[in-house]
């Protein structure tokens, strides 16, 4: 399977990346089949070879998550909501609701205790 991934190059602590098409079993910095673009995370500079990327995508190449994000920003792919992000947001909302319920439950139980203490006296 052909993957679209980032190939690291540059100095230590000053990494830049090339967007490349390579076999999924090859090394990260191994010899690619084709270089398709460039990405510098420090300056946010991105250069994409749109024709070559479209060709590779129509041939069935699978982009990694980071490359998919870069292609979405470049307008080559439609933005899609990733399930892992949606699940994380849903989990956070459930936790917030659970915390709110426990706080309300604690307040109700303390009121009930104070009422029972008043009833005894």
From Swiss-Prot:
Family annotation (InterPro entries): Ribosomal_bS16, Ribosomal_bS16_CS, Ribosomal_bS16_dom_sf
GO cellular component, one term: small ribosomal subunit
One example of a Gene Ontology biological process annotation: translation
GO terms of molecular function: structural constituent of ribosome
Keyword rRNA-binding: no
NCBIfam families xrefs: S16 (TIGR00002)
Name of the protein described by the UniProt record: Small ribosomal subunit protein bS16
Gene behind this protein: rpsP
């Amino acid at each position: 399977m052909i993957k679209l991934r980032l190939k690291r190059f540059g100095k230590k602590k000053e990494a830049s990346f090339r967007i490349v098409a390579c076999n999924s079993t090859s090394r990260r910095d191994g010899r690619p089949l084709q270089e398709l673009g460039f990405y510098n995370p420090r300056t946010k500079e991105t250069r994409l070879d749109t024709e070559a990327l479209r060709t590779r995508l129509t041939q069935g190449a699978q982009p990694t998550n980071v490359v998919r994000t870069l292609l979405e920003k470049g307008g080559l792919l439609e933005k899609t909501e990733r399930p892992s992000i949606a699940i994380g947001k849903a989990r956070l909302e459930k936790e917030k609701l659970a915390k709110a319920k426990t706080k309300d439950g604690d307040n109700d139980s303390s009121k009930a205790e104070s009422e029972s203490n008043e009833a005894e006296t």
